[in-house]
C-alpha cells in the first residue's frame, strides 16, 4: 500500500547567521501532508518504512531537541507521526513552522533546528541517508569545522519520501 501522497514541496533557504551556518546552497524542504495513515496503523512505523524504502535509515522515534542544533556531516529527514509542534529552522534568526502529523521536513546538512513547543502527542521519526556521519553541533566551537564539512556532504541519491523521482533531487541539484 502506498502511503506517500504527491505534494508540492515548500522550500526555504537560510543564510549563515554567524552561529548556525545552514547550508550554503540547498534549501530546507517541507512536504505538507505527505504521508497518509489511518488510526489502525502505527504511523511511526509507516514513516520508518517509507524512509527505509527510499534508502534513508538509522531511524529513531522521539521529539526534536528544545535547543538549536545542526548536523554538519549528514542530512536529516524528520517525519511527524503524531501531534503537532512549533519548530524553528535556520537558527535564532530562522523561521518558525507548525509541523503536524503527516508532514515531513528534509534538512540539508548545516540547517539549524529546534522545537519551541509541542503538544503531548508530538512524535517525530528521524532518518538519515546512507552517506554521511552523524554529529551534533550546538556552539561556536563547532563552527570552523562545520563550515568546511557542510559543503562536502553529497546530495542523497533518493528523496526520503518520493525516491529517485522525488523533488529533492532536482531542488538540491539545481540550487548551486
Predicted regions and their residues:
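Short, conserved beta-strand element in jelly-roll/cupin
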Residues: 71-88, 106
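Conserved metal-binding segment of the jelly-roll/cupin
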Residues: 99-119, 128
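A structural preference for long, well-packed, hydrophobic secondary-structure segments
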Residues: 74, 87-97, 114-115, 130-133, ...
